[in-house]
Regions:
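Short, C-terminally biased terminal segments at protein or domain edges
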Residues: 1-59, 63-129
Length: 129
């Protein structure tokens, strides 16, 4: 049950992958300003969560079946939820400026919507033999 990749050449053509990759870059810039004592705490946790999002999208895209692809997208979705919680915590601890926090929350919500839509579209497609 292979999944069709339609007109996309590779996972880097997916809008949700592009958006989540851009979020990775932004998160790395922001967390670079976190206090040194957070290096192995919240900084590390946030970075792991955000990197997991585009990484699992890419891995899922490379899988052989639609079922595997969807499973990896759900893992990415879980990472988005994890990241959102960590970003809220960092904001409440005043580690992220209010303006940056608002932008991050908006970007995270958009990625969440995009992932839900992609998952739904794949779940509603008939599987190839």
């Amino acid at each position: 049950m292979k999944h069709q990749r339609s007109m996309l050449k590779n996972y880097k053509d997916l809008k949700v992958w592009k958006k989540s990759y851009e979020l990775c870059l932004e998160i790395y810039r922001i967390t670079a300003k976190f206090p040194k004592e957070e290096r192995y705490g919240l900084t590390s946790q946030i970075r792991r969560s955000v990197v997991s999002i585009p990484s699992n999208i890419a891995e899922g895209y490379g899988r052989k079946t639609t079922k595997d692809y969807i499973r990896m997208l759900y893992i990415s979705y879980g990472s988005v939820c994890e990241l959102e919680t960590q970003i809220l915590l960092a904001g409440d601890l005043d580690l992220i400026e209010k303006g940056e926090l608002g932008t991050l929350k908006k970007d995270i919500a958009e990625i969440e919507r995009m992932l839900k839509a992609l998952i739904k579209s794949l779940e509603n497609k008939p599987l190839n033999p």
